[in-house]
Amino acid sequence: MVNVSVNGFGRIGRLVTRIAISRKDINLVAINDPFISTDYAAYMFKYDSTHGRFDGEVSHDKDHIILNGKKVAVFNEKDPAALPWGKLGVDVAIDSTGIFKEMDSANKHIEAGAKKVVITAPSGSAPMYVMGVNEETYTPDQKIVSNASCTTNCLAPLAKVIHNEFGIKEGLMTTVHSMTATQKTVDGPSHKDWRGGRTASGNIIPSSTGAAKAVGKVLPSLQGKLTGMAFRVPTVDVSVVDLTVNLAKETSYDEIKAALKKASEGSMKGILGYTEDDVVSSDFLGDAHSSIVDAAAGIQLTPTFVKLVSWYDNEFGYSTRVVDLVEHVAKSA
């Protein structure tokens, strides 16, 4: 049994909690969020505008949120170093704040007594792991790891299969990405990203993303071969990757589909999905795969030039991988 804590009870923190309490090998011992009281934590956990009502019992007392009869301690510390992770025997602290995403700041959880930390965001300093792609390279001496981003988790499995089978010489990615909490409900100040300050629900907003370049960190053979951008669109959840690649080996679209379908049923089962149906974004709400290939949407121009399309629930699919990585890190200890 792995003792787990969650720091940051936002979109990802709450979904990670839903998934974690459904796993028999995980014991959720605590949640920390400096801005949320236990009654409000219970309310936000119970009701979700996107993923629906929690299918279980939720209540609270002064110091706990009670999930299906199990008491989970709730803390309101701004500084993770002040949390009682040692006293609670925390094996893995999940940091889903989006703030403590570098080695020095995430190390506050180690100072607090946690044995390991999983960051639910890409990191410039912590090693990044994408389940189904490079988790086998994890070594137990690594105390702090990153689960990369939701988009990297969608793109990397797709790129790995294509690169292994046909070779990727270079590629450009566009993610058409649902709104997230960093965006604005109405036009407002956003000094680092002027476009990002525009009304999320009324615009298609071009944005930068490091997700494609990050694939080179989890798949070194693709270092420098991929880059990309994002369009933020007015949907609440589910996003889609459009990957256009120049291949080293001539092939047909049927051969590409066959390779992806084989991977989805074999080595990447549960990580990479595959469909030939005429689907739309809402069909993937609550899908636990990291990436679901839309075989009917892809196109080929020449034997070496192809566009591939793959969907992902950027909240639920990603949160599922966070919990998978926690289990992997704990088992490797």
Swiss-Prot record:
Residue numbers binding D-glyceraldehyde 3-phosphate: 149-151, 180, 209-210, 232
Entry's localization field: Cytoplasm
Keywords annotated in UniProt: Cytoplasm, Glycolysis, NAD, Oxidoreductase
Binding residues annotated for NAD(+), in chain numbering: 11-12, 33, 78, 314
Protein name, UniProt field: Glyceraldehyde-3-phosphate dehydrogenase
Residues annotated as the enzyme's active site: 150 (nucleophile)
Protein EC: 1.2.1.12
InterPro entries xref list: GlycerAld/Erythrose_P_DH (IPR020831), GlycerAld_3-P_DH_AS (IPR020830), GlycerAld_3-P_DH_cat (IPR020829), GlycerAld_3-P_DH_NAD(P)-bd (IPR020828), Glyceraldehyde-3-P_DH_1 (IPR006424), NAD(P)-bd_dom_sf (IPR036291)
Subunit structure as annotated in this protein's UniProt entry: Homotetramer.
Catalytic activity: D-glyceraldehyde 3-phosphate + phosphate + NAD(+) = (2R)-3-phospho-glyceroyl phosphate + NADH + H(+)
Pathway per the UniProt entry: Carbohydrate degradation; glycolysis; pyruvate from D-glyceraldehyde 3-phosphate: step 1/5
Gene Ontology terms, MF aspect: glyceraldehyde-3-phosphate dehydrogenase (NAD+) (phosphorylating) activity; NAD binding; NADP binding
Residues of the site described as Activates thiol group during catalysis: 177
Gene3D superfamilies: Dihydrodipicolinate Reductase, domain 2 (3.30.360.10), NAD(P)-binding Rossmann-like Domain (3.40.50.720)
Gene Ontology biological process terms, A to Z: glucose metabolic process; glycolytic process
Family: Belongs to the glyceraldehyde-3-phosphate dehydrogenase family.
GO cellular component, one term: external encapsulating structure
